[in-house]
C-alpha cells in the first residue's frame, strides 16, 4: 500500500477520504477570545485534486496521545492551494479556521432591542445557521435597550460586544465538529484527562517519554491600577454616575489611574461591571508565564498544575490563554514505516486565580456624519411620542424592521429652545423625514437634530414662486386634510407685505397687562372736496350717536368667567382717524388716563374701580378734529387684567 496513515502521529480526515491526504507539517495557533488558525502542509499521490471539494468543508486532524487516546483539531477549510510537490507526491496547503471565522465573510446593518448581549450573540449565530456553541456563562448581564450592528462584519459585531461585556470564547474539538464555548469565569474551564499535573524537566536531563515542559519564562509588566468611568442619563440629569474599580499590586508603580467617558451605561451597577471588566482585561497582561515542551493534550482554555519546577512558587495552577503548535512528519514512500515525527507546543499562561478578560481589539463602528430617517409609529396613528417628546424612526439602511413603532429606540428631538417647562416644541410626525446625528459617532446613541422636506413631504408654499413667504403651517390631527390647518405666514414681497394668521377653529389671546394695536395713517393726500367732507362728517355723526348711547360711564366688573379669557379676542375695528388733510403726521391710537397722561390699551389695575376718563365733547367731531380712542375695562375674576375694548370717542384740539 503506497499511501497509509496507519502508523503516523497525526491522521488527516478530509472530505476527499481518509487516505487521500497526509500531513507533512502543522503550524497552529489558538487563543482565548480569538480565532484559531492551523496551517497544514499536505501531500497526496493525486496531483489533480479538486480544490473546491475542500474549500469551506470541515476537516479534522487526530493527534496520538500517550495511552492510545487522541486529541482532535477540527476546523473549516478556509483556504487551500497546490504547490509543485516533492518527488512522486503532489503538495497541497490548507488553512483550517473555526466556523466562527465564516462570520468575517458576512456583514449587515441591523438593530437589536431589549436584549442581553449573550442573547444577541446566540441570535446572530442561529440566524447564520450555526448551532455548535455552548453557553458556559456564570455572570448576569444587563439588557440593552438599543444595540446596532452598523456596516461591520457579524464577527466584528459579536466580538466587540463580548469584549465590552467581558465575555470570551474558546473551542472544544471533537472528531466531527468543534464547539465554541462562551465563558466568563474559571468554572468554564477544566483539565484534560491525564494532564491535571504536568512536570517540568530541564533539557539537561535529556529526552523523557512522559509529556512535560522543558522551558519556562515569566514576565511581569507595570499596568494601570484603577479605572474610572462616567456617563450621563438625561432622565436623571443631576445623578452622578462615576464609578471606579481597582486592582492592587505589590510594586511601586501600581496605582496609576485611568479615566474614560462615556462609559456606555446609565445605571451605576452596570458601570461598575464595565469598569471591573476593563481593569481585569488590562491586568491579564500583568503576569504571563510561557512554557515550552511536549504536552500534546493541553490547549487554549485548559487548566493544569505545573510541578517539579525549581522555583516553588511557580508550581501552581495555570489557565492556558494561548497556544502554538508545531508538528513535523517526515515523508515516506511506502506503508512500511512511519518516518520521524515531532510535536512541540508553546503555552501562554496566567495564574488560574486571575480572571481572564479579552483586551478590546475590535474596531467600533463610527457613523461619520448625520443621516436621514423617516418617523414611524403604530398603524393608524399620525403622531407617536412619549413624555419627553421623543419619536421613533426607520433608517434607510435597516432591511429587517417593519417600519412601525418597533423600528428603533425612542430618540430625543432637538428643539429651538428647551427650558424648564418653557421653550418651543414641534413633534415630528409619522412619515416625516428627520436628520439623525449620533453622539460621538456611536450608532447606539442617536439624536434627532433637524427635519427636511422630500418629494412626498413637500413645502407648505409653492416654490420658487413664493420665495418671499415664510412662516409656520400645521395640520389638524387626526384626519386633517390640506384644508385643516393653523398658520402664521409672513409675506416679504416689496409692496405686498403681509402678516397672515389663520386659526382653524378658535383664536384666543391672553394679555396680562396692556395690549396696543397701532395703525400708521395713510400718506398725505390732497384735501377732500366739500362733498366728501360732508359725507365723512355725517358718518362720524352717526357713529358718535350709536357709541354715546351704548357706553357705560365707568369701568365694570364681570361676574361671569366665560366672558373673560375666551373673549379677549374681540377686536374693535375702529381706529383713530385724521379727519382733514394737511395736518402734521402722527400716530392716532392715543388714549389718556384720568391724570391726562398718555395711555395705550386698557386702564391699569388701580383704575379698574374708577370712572373712565372721557374727554368733554359737545356734539359729534368736526372736520379738522383728531379723534382718539379710549377703552372701557372689563375686570375679570381671574388673575391678570384682560380687556374687552370698546371704543369711546373723544375730541382733541
Question: Residue locations for each model-derived region?
Answer:
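Assembly/oligomerization scaffold segments
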Residues: 1-110, 164, 286
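Short alpha-helix capping/helix-loop boundary micro-motifs
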Residues: 39-49, 283-294, 360, 417-423
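Glycine-rich, acidic and aromatic/proline-enriched surface loops and short helix-turn segments
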Residues: 97-99, 114-135, 259-273, 378-406
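Structural signature for extended repeat/solenoid scaffolds and their inter-repeat hinge/linker regions
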Residues: 171, 181-183, 190, 367-584, ...
Amino acid at each position: 500500500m503506497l499511501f497509509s496513515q496507519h502508523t503516523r502521529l497525526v491522521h488527516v480526515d478530509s472530505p476527499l477520504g481518509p487516505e487521500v491526504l497526509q500531513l507533512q507539517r502543522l503550524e497552529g495557533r489558538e487563543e482565548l477570545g480569538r480565532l484559531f488558525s492551523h496551517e497544514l502542509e499536505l501531500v497526496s499521490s493525486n496531483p489533480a485534486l479538486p480544490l473546491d471539494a475542500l474549500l469551506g468543508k470541515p476537516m479534522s486532524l487526530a493527534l496520538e496521545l500517550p495511552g492510545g487516546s487522541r486529541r482532535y483539531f477540527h476546523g473549516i477549510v478556509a483556504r487551500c492551494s497546490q504547490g509543485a510537490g516533492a518527488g512522486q507526491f503532489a503538495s497541497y496547503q490548507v488553512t483550517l479556521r473555526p466556523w466562527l471565522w465564516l462570520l468575517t465573510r458576512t456583514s449587515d446593518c441591523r438593530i437589536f432591542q431589549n436584549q442581553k448581549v449573550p442573547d444577541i450573540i446566540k441570535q446572530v449565530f442561529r440566524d447564520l445557521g450555526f448551532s455548535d456553541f455552548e453557553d458556559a456563562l456564570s455572570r448576569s448581564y444587563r439588557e440593552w435597550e438599543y444595540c446596532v450592528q452598523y456596516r461591520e462584519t457579524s464577527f466584528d459585531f459579536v466580538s466587540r460586544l463580548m469584549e465590552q461585556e467581558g465575555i470570551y470564547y474558546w473551542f472544544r474539538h471533537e472528531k466531527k465538529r468543534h464547539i465554541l464555548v462562551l465563558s466568563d469565569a474559571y468554572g468554564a474551564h477544566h483539565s484534560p484527562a491525564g494532564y491535571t499535573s504536568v512536570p517540568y524537566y530541564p533539557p539537561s536531563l535529556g529526552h523523557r517519554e512522559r509529556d512535560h515542559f522543558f522551558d519556562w519564562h515569566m514576565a511581569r509588566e507595570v499596568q494601570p491600577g484603577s479605572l474610572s468611568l462616567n456617563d450621563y442619563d438625561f432622565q436623571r440629569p443631576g445623578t452622578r454616575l462615576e464609578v471606579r474599580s481597582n486592582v492592587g499590586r505589590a510594586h511601586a508603580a501600581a496605582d496609576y489611574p485611568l479615566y474614560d467617558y462615556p462609559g456606555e451605561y446609565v445605571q451605576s451597577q452596570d458601570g461598575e461591571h464595565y469598569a471591573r471588566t476593563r481593569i481585569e482585561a488590562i491586568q491579564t497582561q500583568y503576569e504571563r508565564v510561557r512554557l515550552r515542551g511536549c504536552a500534546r493534550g493541553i490547549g487554549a482554555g485548559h487548566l493544569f498544575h505545573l510541578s517539579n519546577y525549581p522555583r516553588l512558587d511557580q508550581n501552581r495552577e495555570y489557565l492556558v490563554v494561548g497556544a502554538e503548535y508545531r508538528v513535523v512528519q517526515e515523508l515516506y514512500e511506502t506503508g512500511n514505516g512511519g518516518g520521524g515525527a515531532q510535536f512541540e507546543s508553546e503555552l501562554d499562561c496566567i495564574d488560574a486565580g486571575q480572571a481572564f478578560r479579552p483586551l478590546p481589539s475590535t474596531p467600533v463602528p463610527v457613523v461619520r456624519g448625520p443621516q436621514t430617517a423617516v418617523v414611524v409609529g403604530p398603524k393608524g396613528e399620525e403622531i407617536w411620542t412619549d413624555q419627553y417628546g421623543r419619536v421613533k424612526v426607520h433608517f434607510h439602511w435597516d432591511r429587517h424592521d417593519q417600519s412601525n413603532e418597533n423600528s428603533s429606540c425612542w430618540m430625543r428631538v432637538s428643539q429651538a429652545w428647551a427650558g424648564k417647562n418653557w421653550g418651543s416644541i414641534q413633534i415630528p410626525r409619522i412619515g416625516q423625514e428627520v436628520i439623525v446625528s449620533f453622539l460621538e459617532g456611536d450608532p447606539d446613541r442617536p439624536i434627532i437634530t433637524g427635519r427636511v422636506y422630500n418629494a412626498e413631504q413637500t413645502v407648505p408654499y409653492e416654490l420658487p414662486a413664493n420665495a418671499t413667504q415664510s412662516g409656520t403651517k400645521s395640520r389638524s390631527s387626526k384626519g386633517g386634510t390640506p384644508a385643516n390647518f393653523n398658520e402664521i405666514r409672513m409675506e416679504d414681497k416689496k409692496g405686498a407685505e403681509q402678516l397672515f394668521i389663520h386659526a382653524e377653529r378658535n383664536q384666543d389671546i391672553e394679555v396680562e397687562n396692556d395690549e396696543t394695536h397701532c395703525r400708521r395713517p395713510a400718506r398725505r393726500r390732497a384735501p377732500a372736496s366739500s362733498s366728501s367732507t360732508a359725507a365723512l362728517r355725517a358718518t362720524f355723526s352717526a357713529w358718535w350717536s350709536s357709541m354715546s348711547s351704548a357706553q357705560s360711564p365707568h369701568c365694570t366688573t364681570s361676574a361671569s368667567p366665560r366672558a373673560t379669557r375666551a373673549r379677549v379676542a374681540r377686536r374693535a375695528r375702529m381706529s383713530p382717524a385724521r379727519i382733514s388733510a394737511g395736518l402734521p403726521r402722527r400716530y392716532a391710537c392715543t388714549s389718556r388716563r384720568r391724570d391726562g397722561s398718555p395711555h395705550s390699551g386698557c386702564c391699569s389695575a388701580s383704575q379698574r374701580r374708577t370712572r373712565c376718563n372721557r374727554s368733554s365733547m359737545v356734539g359729534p367731531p368736526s372736520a379738522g378734529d383728531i379723534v382718539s380712542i379710549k377703552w372701557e375695562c372689563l375686570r375679570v375674576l381671574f388673575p391678570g387684567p384682560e380687556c374687552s375694548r370698546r371704543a369711546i370717542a373723544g375730541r382733541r384740539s
